[in-house]
C-alpha cells in the first residue's frame, strides 16, 4: 500500500513538473497575410510568425508593389479569403498609399474587410512605417499612424502598431537598421514586425520567446522588449 502511495505521488509530481515546464499553451491560429514585398521579404512575415507560434498555420499573398485595390481585383486573394479557412486576415497597404491616397486605401480596406468578416475571420491592419524616400510626399511616421488609426476607427478593426514599434526602436537605438533607403525591411525590421504581430494576435508578450529569426541575440532581446513596450505588455 505504501509503495502504491509513493508511486502515485511521484507520478503526480512528475506530471506537475512536465506541465509547468511546457509554459503557457497558446491557442492555434490560422493567419493569412495579404500585402506586398513589405510582408514578403526576408523569408516572409508568415514564416517568422510561425517561429514564435509553431502550433499555428500561416500563409501570405504578397505580389510586389500590390495595393489593397490590386488585391481586391485579384481572384487568388479573394478565393483565399472566401475559403473560410482563416481565423485572422492581416491587410498591409502599399507603403505610400495609406497617406497619399487615403480614400482609395479606405475604399478597398472596407471592401476586403467585408469579405473577411463574411468568411468568419477577423481583420487586422498592418500599420507600416515611415518611408525615408517619401517624407517629402508626406509619408511620415505621424501621417502613417494617423491614417491607419483613422481607418481602424472608421471600420471598427484592430490595427497592429508596427510603426510605433519602429519609431520606439530607432529612438532608443538610432544605429539599428530596420529598413533600407526605399523603406523595405531588413531582417531586423521583419523580426520586429513579427514580434509585434505575435504579441498582438496571441496577446502574449514576445519577451523570452526562444525564436530569434536571423538577428543577433542582442538585437533579438532588444526587439522583443520594444515590441512588448509598444503593445503595453
Q: What spans do the regions from the language model cover?
A:
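Structural beta-sheet core signal
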Residues: 33, 125-127
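Catalytic His-Asp segment of secreted/periplasmic serine-dependent ester chemistry enzymes
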Residues: 138-233
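Serine-dependent acyl-ester chemistry module
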Residues: 88, 94-96, 100, 131-143
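Bacterial N-terminal signal peptides that target proteins for export
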Residues: 1-9
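Bacterial lipoprotein signal-peptidase II cleavage site
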Residues: 23-29
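Conserved SGNH/GDSL esterase-like catalytic core that processes O-acyl groups on lipids
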Residues: 29-34, 38-110
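C-terminal motif of bacterial Sec signal peptides marking the signal peptidase cleavage site
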Residues: 18-21
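A short helix->loop->beta-strand "cap" motif at the edges of active sites that frequently abuts
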Residues: 114-124, 157
Amino acid at each position: 500500500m505504501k509503495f502504491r502511495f509513493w508511486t502515485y505521488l511521484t507520478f503526480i509530481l512528475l506530471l506537475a513538473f512536465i506541465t509547468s515546464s511546457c509554459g503557457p499553451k497558446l491557442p492555434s491560429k490560422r493567419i493569412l497575410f495579404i500585402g506586398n514585398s513589405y510582408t514578403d521579404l526576408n523569408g516572409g512575415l508568415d514564416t517568422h510568425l510561425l517561429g514564435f507560434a509553431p502550433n499555428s498555420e500561416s500563409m501570405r499573398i504578397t505580389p510586389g508593389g500590390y495595393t489593397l485595390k490590386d488585391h481586391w481585383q485579384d481572384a487568388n486573394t479573394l478565393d483565399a479569403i472566401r475559403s473560410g479557412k482563416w481565423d485572422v486576415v492581416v491587410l498591409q497597404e502599399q507603403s505610400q498609399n495609406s497617406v497619399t491616397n487615403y480614400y482609395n486605401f479606405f475604399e478597398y480596406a472596407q471592401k476586403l474587410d467585408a469579405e473577411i468578416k463574411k468568411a468568419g475571420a477577423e481583420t487586422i491592419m498592418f500599420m507600416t512605417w515611415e518611408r525615408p524616400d517619401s517624407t517629402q510626399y508626406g509619408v511620415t511616421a505621424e501621417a502613417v499612424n494617423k491614417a491607419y488609426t483613422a481607418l481602424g476607427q472608421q471600420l471598427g478593426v484592430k490595427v497592429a502598431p508596427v510603426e510605433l514599434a519602429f519609431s520606439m526602436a530607432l529612438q532608443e537605438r538610432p544605429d539599428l537598421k530596420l529598413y533600407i533607403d526605399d523603406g523595405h525591411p531588413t531582417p531586423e525590421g521583419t523580426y520586429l514586425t513579427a514580434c509585434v504581430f505575435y504579441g498582438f494576435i496571441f496577446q502574449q508578450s514576445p519577451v523570452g520567446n526562444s525564436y530569434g529569426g536571423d538577428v543577433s541575440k542582442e538585437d533579438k532581446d532588444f526587439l522583443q522588449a520594444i515590441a512588448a513596450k509598444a503593445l503595453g505588455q
